[in-house]
From Swiss-Prot:
GO terms for cellular component: cytoplasm; Holliday junction resolvase complex
Major site of localization recorded for this protein: cytoplasm
Region (Head domain (RuvB-H)): 260-362
Start and end residues of each stretch annotated as Small ATPAse domain (RuvB-S): 187-257
Keywords: ATP-binding, Cytoplasm, DNA damage, DNA recombination, DNA repair, DNA-binding, Hydrolase, Nucleotide-binding
Residues bound to DNA: 296, 315, 320
Keyword Transmembrane helix belongs to the record: no
Any single biological process term in GO: DNA repair
The enzyme's E.C. designation: 3.6.4.-
Reactions the enzyme catalyzes: ATP + H2O = ADP + phosphate + H(+)
Function noted in UniProt: The RuvA-RuvB-RuvC complex processes Holliday junction (HJ) DNA during genetic recombination and DNA repair, while the RuvA-RuvB complex plays an important role in the rescue of blocked DNA replication forks via replication fork reversal (RFR). RuvA specifically binds to HJ cruciform DNA, conferring on it an open structure. The RuvB hexamer acts as an ATP-dependent pump, pulling dsDNA into and through the RuvAB complex. RuvB forms 2 homohexamers on either side of HJ DNA bound by 1 or 2 RuvA tetramers; 4 subunits per hexamer contact DNA at a time.
Protein name: Holliday junction branch migration complex subunit RuvB
Residues reported to bind Mg(2+): 71
Taxonomic source organism: Rhodospirillum centenum (strain ATCC 51521 / SW)
Length: 362
């Protein structure tokens, strides 16, 4: 099944169809923004300092897993500074002319937000360096012997870059951001406040316990929490429930196959495949992809991260391996310790692995 045809998951951290509705419940100021305390406090200080000096805020790099509020925070920065906001993404800026058009239309101190900034092409990055450092744009006009260099002065501006893969950002680009900020997963109590706020905006009567039930199943991600909240509203609304409590919210989410830990049917199918078909691993990701009918990048980017974060899955040099917690989650007894140690040290395991260096898909 190709990625465009793959069923969308409610617990997907990346944007999916229907997520446009989340804009209606986004916070509009740092005071309304819940969670990310250190990021908020630091940004507040830097914004106050920039406003006091009547200067553009230094360039900001927001990095972390998807769905944690990087776009929302960029919009809030512009609102707190009381300046204009322009948004684009790395893949959209295909050539230097596209970037030049964006930069030359900025007003003094405006915020330019580039999502997926790690996907900028090298040619565009080269143009961006002097724009960020000196607020100047160096362009080549014409071709061949008639080509000439033109320098355009730009108004001071703030570039806010966002990425889920900070390791792919080149070092020269990374060093030009004066304010790098890492976004962390949210605690259930923080997500409970976010869910409760969203319910109020949506006109939904949700108890505190109901909000916490949704929060616990949201994978530490506000985007997932908002998505689950809207689906709970749909199910409970059709059922005629005026007030949604923990039992009603839990029942709705169980109906959607999202369990108390935030795992869905695809997560369980993945874990079951390793346990039942490959003796708990180690097994290569290409083999798993073939068994599940999924591409490697789908497994690595959308399924495995949360399983690893929760301690149910381990990546080893020989492939994927269920942890003791993974076995217990499936209701299975963990294997004997000596066999597990042999797998981790590279010995032949129940997954039928090959000696290190001969495997094709770890």
């Amino acid at each position: 099944m190709s990625p465009p045809d793959r069923p969308q998951r409610l617990v997907e951290q990346d944007r999916i169809g229907g997520d446009a509705a989340e804009a209606s419940i986004r916070p509009l100021s740092l005071a309304e923004f819940i969670g990310q305390r250190q990021v908020r406090e630091n940004l507040s200080v830097f914004i106050q300092a920039a406003r006091g000096r009547k200067e553009a805020l230094d360039h900001v790099l927001l990095f972390g897993p998807p769905g944690l509020g990087k776009t929302t925070l960029a919009q809030i920065v512009a609102k707190e500074l009381n300046v204009g906001f322009r948004a684009t993404s790395g893949p959209v800026i295909a050539k230097a002319g596209d970037l030049a058009a964006l930069l030359t239309n900025l007003q003094p101190h405006d915020v330019l937000f580039i999502d997926e900034i790690h996907r900028l092409s090298p040619a565009v990055e080269e143009i961006l360096y002097p724009a960020m450092e000196d607020f100047q744009l160096d362009l080549i006009i014409g071709e061949g012997p008639a080509a000439r260099s033109v320098r355009i002065d730009l108004p001071p501006f703030t570039l806010v870059g966002a990425t889920t893969r900070s390791g792919l950002i080149t070092r020269p680009l990374r060093e030009r951001f004066g304010i790098p900020l890492r976004m962390q997963f949210y605690e259930p109590e923080e997500l409970q406040l976010i869910v409760a706020r969203g319910a109020r905006i949506l006109g939904m009567e949700l108890t505190g316990e109901g909000a916490l039930e949704i929060a616990r199943r949201s994978r530490g991600t506000p985007r997932v929490a908002g998505r689950l909240l809207r689906r709970v509203r749909d199910i409970c609304g059709v059922a005629g429930l005026a007030v949604v409590d923990a039992a009603a919210a839990g029942g709705a989410l169980t109906r959607l196959e999202v369990d108390r830990l935030g795992f869905d049917a695809m997560d369980r199918r993945y874990l079951r495949c390793i346990a039942d078909n490959y003796g708990g691993g180690p097994v290569g990701v290409e083999t798993l992809g073939a068994a599940l009918g999924e591409q490697r990048d789908v497994l690595e980017e959308t399924i495995e991260p949360y399983l690893i974060q929760q301690g149910l899955l381990q990546r080893t040099p020989r492939g994927r391996l269920l942890t003791d917690s993974g076995y217990r989650y499936l209701g299975l007894p963990p294997p004997a310790t000596p066999a597990r140690q042999l797998d981790l040290l590279g010995g032949a395991g129940p997954g039928g692995g090959t000696p290190e260096g001969e495997g094709e898909d770890v």
